[in-house]
């Protein structure tokens, strides 16, 4: 066998090996995304959620307001601690939403393991002015009630509210770090605004 023939045979073998390896790499890379997408689809589901007209105090990592949510396959409301991405809630409005819910892999310990996104708003119904919302056993902590001098108003867990004529909001505010539990009654004023009607 001549030296030239030997070199040609080695070159041919090398070319075949390169093509074979390239083909394997291409096959593996195309299969992986397909499997990943299949898993993502399996973990995502669409649901219909009913959202109540008022938010409820709750405690996750810290004290906050939680939406009252009732999926269409459940009979009672439960508290939703996380966000609904793409949805802007307004107090005094009842909503029916179509949402997608998916699992979150490797979520932080203080975060939800589920991601909820707004798909569509099916209906919105506003409460009548004067509708009352009673929040029971509110634990008064430092950030439960905030008074903003610049805005000249109070906030309850981030939600602005006004004080009706005969309510002593100053006294209530002075109790915010005592840990006392109080019942708060808010009244709907229209345009997503609320006023504190009573506390005890």
Report each predicted region and the residues it spans:
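Bacterial signal peptide processing site
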Residues: 25-28
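Structural detector for short beta-strands of small beta-barrel domains
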Residues: 37-62, 130-148
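Short, basic/aromatic beta-hairpin or loop at an interaction surface
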Residues: 65-76, 156-161
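Flexible glycine-rich surface loops and low-complexity tracts that mediate binding to linear polymers
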Residues: 95-104, 176-191
């Amino acid at each position: 066998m001549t030296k030239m023939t030997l070199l040609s045979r080695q070159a041919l073998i090398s070319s075949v090996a390169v093509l074979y390896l390239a083909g394997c790499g291409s096959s593996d890379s195309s299969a992986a995304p397909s499997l990943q997408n299949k898993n993502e689809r399996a973990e995502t589901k669409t649901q219909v959620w009913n959202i109540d007209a008022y938010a409820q105090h709750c405690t996750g990592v810290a004290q906050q307001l939680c939406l009252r949510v009732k999926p269409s396959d459940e009979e009672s409301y439960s508290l939703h601690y996380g966000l609904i991405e793409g949805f802007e809630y307004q107090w005094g409005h009842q909503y029916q939403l179509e949402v997608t819910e998916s699992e979150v892999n490797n979520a932080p310990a203080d975060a939800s393991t589920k991601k909820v996104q707004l798909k569509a708003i099916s209906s919105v119904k506003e409460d009548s002015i004067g509708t009352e919302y009673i929040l029971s056993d509110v634990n008064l902590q430092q950030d439960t009630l905030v008074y903003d001098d610049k805005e000249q108003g109070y906030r309850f867990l981030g939600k602005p509210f006004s004080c009706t004529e005969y309510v002593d909001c100053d006294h209530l505010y002075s109790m915010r770090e005592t840990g006392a539990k109080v019942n708060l009654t808010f009244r709907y004023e229209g345009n997503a605004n609320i006023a504190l009607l009573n506390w005890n």
